Amino acid sequence: MSGISLFGVRPVNRRCRIRALCICNSHPANRTFVPQTPEPETAMSSRKFGLNLVVVLAIAALFTGFWALINRPVSAPNWPEQISGFSYSPFQQGQFPQKDQYPTDDEMRRDLEIMSKLTDNIRIYSVDGTLQDIPKLAEEFGLRVTLGIWISPDQERNEREITRAIELANTSRSVVRVVVGNEAIFRKEITAKELSVLLDRVRAAVKVPVTTSEQWHVWEEHPELAKHVDLIAAHVLPYWEFIPVDKAGQFVFDRARDLKKMFPKKPLLLSEVGWPSNGRMRGGADASPADQAIYLRTLVNKLNRQGFNYFVIEAFDQPWKASDEGSVGAYWGVFNAARQQKFNFEGPVVAIPQWRVLAIGSVVLALLSLTLLMIDGSALRQRGRTFLTFIAFLCGSVLVWIGYDYSQQYSTWFSLTVGFLLALGALGVFIVLLTEAHELAEAVWIHKRRREFLPVVGDSDYRPKVSIHVPCYNEPPEMVKQTLNALANLDYPDFEVLIIDNNTKDPAVWEPVRDYCATLGPRFKFFHVSPLAGFKGGALNYLIPHTAKDAEVIAVIDSDYCVHPNWLKHMVPHFADPKIAVVQSPQDYRDQNESTFKKLCYAEYKGFFHIGMVTRNDRDAIIQHGTMTMTRRSVLEELGWADWCICEDAELGLRVFEKGLSAAYYHDSYGKGLMPDTFIDFKKQRFRWAYGAIQIIKRHTRSLLRGKDTELTRGQRYHFLAGWLPWVADGMNIFFTVGALLWSAAMIIVPQRVDPPLLIFAIPPLALFVFKVGKIIFLYRRAVGVNLKDAFCAALAGLALSHTIAKAVLYGFFTSSIPFFRTPKNADNHGFWVAISEAREELFIMLLLWGAALGIFLVQGIPSNDMRFWVAMLLVQSLPYVAALIMAFLSSLPKPATAPEPAPVV
C-alpha cells in the first residue's frame, strides 16, 4: 500500500517489475518464467500519469460545465423604482403568532424603512398584538396602509380585531382601506352571508373603502359579496394552481380580465401576487429563487405599465407559516427572514449566484474521494480509473448540491435534528456507493490478478500430512456417508479424517455415521461428545488435541460437502510458503437444479466467491469460511476457534491476518454441498453470517478502525470494513423505512401542513438501490459469466435477504450473542401458508409501504415531481420485501419425487 498517488501509479523498481511477470505464489517447480524486456518504468509511468490527468481534467470540466449549464444567466426586466405595494407580515425568525410572539416597534420600524425605498403602500393582515402599531409607524416613512382584520372561528378575537381596526382606521392618517378577512371563506371558517354582515358593519363605521380578500375563484363562486364591498380584492397565485412559471404571468392577467368583466363597476385590487423561492413542486410550478426573480421582475413591470393596483406577497419570508401552509409558506418574501435581498433587482438572473464556489467545492470533494479510491490502484485499467473518476465527481457534486440546498432551508430544532440525521444517512449512502463502485472496478477492469494461487500439480511438490475435521450436529446419516465416501476417494498420500458429532440426542442419527466410519479404515475416526459447549467452534477445538501429531495442516469441511479427489493434492502445496496460514477454496453447491428456489439461491451464493473473494484475495483479505478451508496446524493450535462467535471461521481468518500471516484463495470449486431447502433456513443462515460480522467488528474494533496492535495492512482493514459496510447500510435502512412510513402517515393525516421530504434526501437511497441492482447484474454477466436471467435471479435472491440482514445487524449491535443455528439439510419444504408466514415481517412492511403510497395518492394525488418521486421511493423501498415473498412462495413449491444424485465435482 505504499506509493499512494491520486492516479493509482506506484513507482516500482525494475527488479520488482520483472518478478511480477511470474506467478508470485505457485510452487517453484511449477512456475513458468518468460523473460521479457520491460518498458522503462519512468516512461510508462509518465504516460499513464498524463493520461489519467487528462481524464480527471476532462471529467472535472464536464461536471463544472453542468454547474454552469444549470446556472446560465437568464434575462429579465429590472425591478422598477416603485411597485404598487407589499404584503407585510412583520414576524422575525423565531417569532410565532400562534405563541403570541410579536415583533418590537424597532424591528418593525427597520422593516418599514426597507419597504419605503421600494413602495408607498403596504398591506397588513391583522391588528393583534404589536401589529396595531404599524399604522402609526408607517406615518414616519410616508407609507399608506391597507389595514387587515383577521377573521377566524374565534368570535371573541374577531370582535377585538374589528373594534381595534375601526378605531385605527378612524384615527390614523396612514390607513387608506380596510380588508375584513383574508381567505376566510376559502378556509371555510365563515360563510359568505356571515362575512357580508361583518363587511356592512365595518363599512358603516369607517370612512375609507372596505373589502374582503379572497382567491379569485371565490369571488366567482360568491358574486353576492360585491354588494357589500367597495372594491374587489383578489388573490391570483399561479403557483397554487399548478401553472408553470413561464405561463404564470398570462394567467394573472387572464384572471384579472375575468374579474373586471364580472364586476365592471368595482375597482380591482390584486391583493396578493407572488411566487415562492423554495418548497415542493406543484405540477409544473417549481418554487425556486430563479423562478421567483424572473416571475416577479417580469410581472410587476407589466402590472405597472397596465396601471393595476397590487400587493406583492410578500416583503419578507415568514418561517412561521410553514406550520400552516407547508414548507413553501415560509418562502414568499422578496427579502429573506434576515431581511436580506433574495435576488438581484438588475441584470441577468442566475439560479445560484455562487455556483462557481459550489463547483470548486464539488471538485475538491471529488478529488479527495478519488484519492482514496485510487489508493493502491495501479492494477486498474484505464476504463476502471475513468469509471471511478466519474463516480467520484458525481458523488461530490450531489453531496455539495445536497448541502447547499439544505442550507437554504429555515430550520427549527426538529428540522435540524431530522436534517442532521438525513445528512448522515446521505453521507453513508455515498460512502457505500463509492465502495460498491470500487469493488465493481476492481472486479472487471483490472490488468491481472495480483495474487494467483493456481492448482499445484507437480508430483514432487510439498505434501504434508493433513487432518480433515468434519463437524456434525443432527445431520442426515446418508448425506454424511456421501461426504465420507468423497473423502475416502481423495488422491493424496497422507491424511486422516476426524468426524465429531456434538450434542445430537438421537442415537439413530449419529450411530449409523459412527458405524460407517469403522468400515472406512484407520484414516477415519469418529467422536460423539454430548454435552459440548461452544457450538461449531467448540466442536472443532475439541478435535485439535486429537489430531495426529505429525499432521501439519488441518482442513475443515461441512458434513454435506462432497470434495474433489484432487482438492488436497492441488491446494496443500501452497503451504510450502511459510507465510501462508490459510488456504481457502470456494463454497459451492450441487443441488441448484432441484428447484427454482434453489436456482435463485445458487445464483446469489455464486457472486461472493467469484467476485468479492477474488478482489479481496488481491490484498490478502479473504473471508475464511468454515468449509473447504485449510489452516496451518501450528497457527490453529495457537489461535484456536472462537467459541464466542457464531462465525468462528471468519473471526479466525481475521486473527490470522492480525498476526501478519497470509491466506491463499483459488476461485475454482473443489467441493460441493447442499443449500437450504426453505426460505426460512436461507434467512437464518444469512442472519448468522451478518450477526457474526457485527460480532467480529465489535470485538476487533481497535485493529480494524484504528490499526492498533495489529499487523493488518490498510488494504486488509479496508476490505473487512468495506465488505461488511453494505450489511450495516441494510441495518440503517430500517430506520429510513420507519421514518418514511411515519412521514407518509403525517402527509396523509395533515396533508396541508406536511410536504414530502426534500427531494435531495430521497434521491440518494434510490440511487444506491438502482446502482446496487445494476452492479449485481453487470458483475454477474462480466465477472461470473452467467446469462441475464441468472444475474436477475441473483439480484432477486439478494434483495429478499435485505430485511433479514438488517435485523441481524441491529441485533448484532445491541446484543452480545445468540444461539448458533445449524442449517438443516434435506429438509422437507413447507406448504404455501407456512412459507408465507415465515416472511410475515416482510409482508407486513410491504403492505405498510404500499398502503402509504396509496394513501398519499388518494389524499394528495401526485401533482408534482417531488410527490411522484416520494411515492416511487415508497414503492421501490418495498421491492426487497416483495422479493422475500417471491422467494417464500418458490420455496413452498413441491420438490421432485426423488432427490438428484450428487453432481460430479470439478
Regions found by a protein language model. Name each.
Residues 484-494:
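Short, acidic, metal-binding catalytic loop of nucleotide-sugar glycosyltransferases
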Residues 77-80, 93, 97-100, 281-291, ...:
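Aromatic-rich peripheral "rim/lid" segments of glycoside hydrolase catalytic domains that contact
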Residues 558-562:
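The conserved acidic donor/metal-binding loop of glycosyltransferases
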Residues 515-552, 565-646, 651, 657-658, ...:
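Long helical/loop segments within the catalytic core of UDP-sugar-dependent glycosyltransferases
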Residues 493, 501-513, 530-533:
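A conserved acidic beta->alpha catalytic loop
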Residues 382-431, 458, 726-819, 835-906:
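Membrane-embedded multi-pass helical conduit in multi-pass membrane proteins
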Residues 465-467, 496, 651:
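Cell-envelope/extracellular polymer assembly enzymes that use nucleotide-activated donors
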Residues 147, 176, 214-255, 275-276:
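Aromatic- and acid-rich polysaccharide-binding/catalytic face
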